[in-house]
Amino acid sequence: MVIRGVGIDIVSMSRFEKVYAKHGQRFIAEFFAEEEQSMPLASLAARFAAKEAVKKALNTPSILFKNIVIGSPAREAKIVGQEIQGRVWVSISHEKDNAVAIAIWEAD
């Protein structure tokens, strides 16, 4: 297996909270898989960063955010409805001001 792509993203917690305050559950339903939707806002922000990092690593902008499911604990990403070669490894973290994630796509 070789590294085929790397993506990284950072999300401002305050900006994420503002988007949620404006759009509420509609925002959550559009960007998160059903099993993710009940998570705390800080965890959702971290998963949003992870989904963005996965899109960057795979270089496939057509994948919907909702179809990128971050494993729990966040180690591997799955793409619902789309088969990808290899695996996408994910590491995420969040603290008071920011959430950050990196994704590494590994394939033959």
Curated annotation (Swiss-Prot):
One BP annotation, GO: fatty acid biosynthetic process
Catalytic activity annotation: apo-[ACP] + CoA = holo-[ACP] + adenosine 3',5'-bisphosphate + H(+)
Main localization of the protein described in the UniProt heading: cytoplasm
Subcellular location: Cytoplasm
UniProt keyword Coiled coil, yes or no: no
Binding site for Mg(2+): 9, 52
Cofactor dependency: Mg(2+)
Top-tier EC class: transferase
GO cellular component terms listed in the entry, alphabetical order: cytoplasm
Superkingdom per UniProt: Bacteria
Known EC number: 2.7.8.7
GO molecular function: holo-[acyl-carrier-protein] synthase activity; magnesium ion binding
Function: Transfers the 4'-phosphopantetheine moiety from coenzyme A to a Ser of acyl-carrier-protein.
Family: Belongs to the P-Pant transferase superfamily. AcpS family.
Name the UniProt record assigns to this protein: Holo-[acyl-carrier-protein] synthase
Native source organism of the sequence: Coprothermobacter proteolyticus (strain ATCC 35245 / DSM 5265 / OCM 4 / BT)
Classification of source organism: Bacteria, Pseudomonadati, Coprothermobacterota, Coprothermobacteria, Coprothermobacterales
Gene it is expressed from: acpS
